[in-house]
Curated annotation (Swiss-Prot):
Taxonomy, superkingdom: Bacteria
GO molecular function, one term: tRNA (guanine(46)-N7)-methyltransferase activity
Name of this protein: tRNA (guanine-N(7)-)-methyltransferase
The keyword tRNA processing appears for this protein: yes
Known pathway: tRNA modification; N(7)-methylguanine-tRNA biosynthesis
Organism whose genome encodes this protein: Lachnoclostridium phytofermentans (strain ATCC 700394 / DSM 18823 / ISDg) (Clostridium phytofermentans)
Amino acid sequence: MRLRNIPGSREYIAQNDYVVHDPEQKKGKWHEVFGNNNPIHIEIGMGKGQFITSLAMQNPNINYIGIEKYSSVLLRAIEKREEYEGDNLYFLRFDAESITDIFAPSEVDRIYLNFSDPWPKDRHSKRRLTSSEFLARYDQFLVKDGYVAFKTDNRDLFDFSLEQVTLSGWQLRDVTFDLHHSEYVEGNIMTEYEERFSSMGNPIHRLVAFREKE
């Protein structure tokens, strides 16, 4: 999908107080950013921010970090953020390839991946956010009981993700191939993509992956 560039988006983001501009310097210190020791949940590839902003509004005692690498998309998330007066949500313009540079061991409690880029070509499989390579990264900074929650309408990507989770030695739970007609739909917050795809009749797939640590 080609993203439309919005003139001035980078400059606006660079001056916005809801965006952390030096995330590498916050590694191991995110609780200082929020000013408390509440759990930290992150969304990688948050898009226009509807999902994570809704979560932050519903859960003021949880800290949220939304990560998006495209400036024009992040700008839309900031617009939503500016309508929310809470102090438990920050954004990063950052490429998840280097995510271990910004989070220390046991610093994150939960990771959300929603409608991630499927990178359909086999040679790009390592770029998929549910690949074994990315799972190994997440394992470095998730707490002992932390987990990854993943949603997609792409069946090929979902099948790949199920396989990668198992091959990586992680465990699966709450797996469904049709979220909106399953027991797991209660409390589900939809993303912009999810609203569109489900309205077209596309089933939404969901899994939770966790690693049993000693």
